[in-house]
Amino acid sequence: PDSLHELLYGKDNAATDDVHIRLNSYGGSCNAATRMFDDIRAYPGSVKITVSGTAASAATVLCMAADRLEMTPGSLFMIHDPSTVAYGNERDMDEAKAVLRACKESILNMYGTRIRISRDDAADMMMKTSWMDANEAFEKGFVDGVTETPAKLPTDSAGHKVSLDTAK
């Protein structure tokens, strides 16, 4: 599969099968991560995500939608305030700032579906840019557990290898 949506809802998947995704990503667009979050949440089967390497920035957002979220012991999890590049006049800068504020609130809403720390604490961690090892991410409720490094890459029901690795 070329995309998460295709993995979950493509012709080779029964759209009810349990899915296990091994994730390694430095992130990307807030909007794309929100779409992936929504796709995972709407999926009728169980979705397990194992962070193997790094889940950073927008990649942490889609992780929040998993039914089960684990990290391997050597993996890292990073949250930070959203950022952008803006060009234009004062009004354009105000608009860019408003979009960033709204994006942060949206991310905090999605974090709030899982984390065991307060929204204010999560916002403070984002403002500071916070890197967490697997144990700290577990303690703060970002992940459900720390797991051993898988010996084999998981496969879906059609036998496809399932790995989202954008950190190449």
Where do the protein language model's features map onto the residues?
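N-terminal organellar transit peptides
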Residues: 1-60, 65-168
